Amino acid sequence: MNNGRIVRINGPLVVADNMKNAQMYEVVEVGEPRLIGEITRIEGDRAFIQVYEDTSGIKPNEPVYRTGAPLSIELGPGLIGKIFDGLQRPLDSIKELTKSPFIARGIKVPSVDRKTKWHFIPKVKKGDKIEGGDIIGIVNETPLVEHRILVPPYVHGTLKEIVAEGDYTVEDPIAVVDMNGDEVPIRLMQRWPVRIPRPFREKLEPTEPLLTGTRVLDTIFPIAKGGTAAIPGPFGSGKTVTLQSLAKWSAAKIVIYVGCGERGNEMTDELRQFPSLKDPWTGRPLLERTILVANTSNMPVAAREASIYVGITMAEYFRDQGYDTLLVADSTSRWAEALRDLGGRMEEMPAEEGFPSYLPSRLAEYYERAGRVKTVGKPERFGSVTVASAVSPPGGDFTEPVTSQTLRFVKVFWPLDVSLAQARHYPAINWLQGFSAYVDLVANWWNTNVDPKWREMRDMMVRTLIREDELRQIVRLVGPESLAEKDKLVLETARLIKEAFLKQNAYDDIDAFSSPQKQARVMRLIYLFNTHASRLVERGIPTKKIVDSMGQLLPEIIRSKAAIKNDELNKYDELERKLISVFENLEKEAGT
């Protein structure tokens, strides 16, 4: 394979000639330090290479070494609990090797530890017919994750050999497949190109909600397992904290957190918190189900794109094992800015605000890899990849290209409002601008498993919030006294919804995570208040009298979110009894 020669260097873009027969997206090693790069354009025998490491110090005429392979990652036991850079190099291994807090250029470190032995339990026997995606055995990687060893998608045939139960490294052959006369070894580890989606048998409709423990996300704008969501918001509106809450408390089996071009201290927060936090679904440390990809703002710009693809490829791998995975990306705007930077250096025709014209297709490729699927292989299983991405529009302008294009491809929109954040209303998700296309799909699950009136109660809350916004303009002009009594009740109910339900403290031990049952109990109290109070208002009782009769009951309902634990829901029975008792007394008064 002929090596190329550098002719031009422009930041992360390197142009090399003598690259005849090179392939698009082929990985090359650039210059004497052998920096990792990827071919993004070919003109004759000249290749344009985006380099994923700092190019300072390399010179024209230095060699470019071809590998003949696309950018691929290693998939196997040893991924869980690790933190990787944007090229899937484990940061702890780099630190041990270099004895430095910085990543040395051109360093080569295996993504999956070659020395660790894993206890392999075979699930197939010699002579079995196997195909791509079949589970041939398991490795208990962590107490939370049973790592299912899959036949690579392109392998099929008769199982000629399979090892006995025992301890093996990721490079040891554990099986041999007779594939049309060729003997193909299977190891615990496999490689997969990051830009190619992993195959599946069938894409399914997402009908089960991905529970997050955040009330506004679960109830007002729910996301389904296999769904796509965007969280746009200006600086300081709470994007990172919202995404961290998602990563901490979501009911996903595997969480992959990609820090793409954001500040390094945010990744540090994750690493400090996750080992000490317990998964509310299993009681185990959160790091036992989490993979972190750190491609922070001070790392090379070009590697931001790689980090996004690395994250979603790992998510697809665990999906193929039959797991529900969540990919959290913070933030896709930084990736888009990297595309803009590289597009400018390659002298491409810019589109709106300087972003490349292919930005929508790149975003579409990324979001289309989400979904709930029936996987290939035996036994039959179902898995999902849910994608939640932050978008960082400058100045909170949602009409800028990255936000507006993202809106075309996502089904859930969680817009963060800086005015809510300034008013200390967190999560600062604007209930008027947001939307979810999954409400109808997940309503049946909520009605069946949590509360048969869930949809009715949710719709009442949404209607009340919309009506309150309409009334706010009138209140500003003439004051609340001029409103009809039923409209005064709308304002009171909306206040209760916001204070008791929508506001949530991500740093409170009790309030940080609300179980579906607890959410339904709080909704039920608000629903009862609104229903009974509406009847009394129709009978001529003023809203002020109803609120005054409540005494300390409404503040008690508001405080309950941080006072009543998820396993103490019987305490809501007492609040319900008190609420109904107040209304019964008011109805007796109204009847006389």
Curated annotation (Swiss-Prot):
Query: Topologically, how does it sit relative to the membrane?
Result: Peripheral membrane protein
Q: Answer whether the UniProt record assigns the keyword Mitochondrion to this protein.
A: no
Tell me the compartments it is located in: Cell membrane
> Which residues are in coiled coils?
none
The keyword Phosphoprotein is assigned to this record: no
What range does the record give for the signal peptide? Answer: none
Q: Which UniProt keywords apply?
A: ATP synthesis, ATP-binding, Cell membrane, Hydrogen ion transport, Ion transport, Membrane, Nucleotide-binding, Translocase, Transport
Q: Locate the residues binding ATP.
A: 233-240
Q: What is its EC number?
A: 7.1.2.2
Instruction: Family membership, please give it.
Output: Belongs to the ATPase alpha/beta chains family.
Q: Which NCBIfam families match?
A: ATP_syn_A_arch, PRK04192.1
Q: What is this protein called?
A: A-type ATP synthase subunit A
What is the gene name?
Answer: atpA
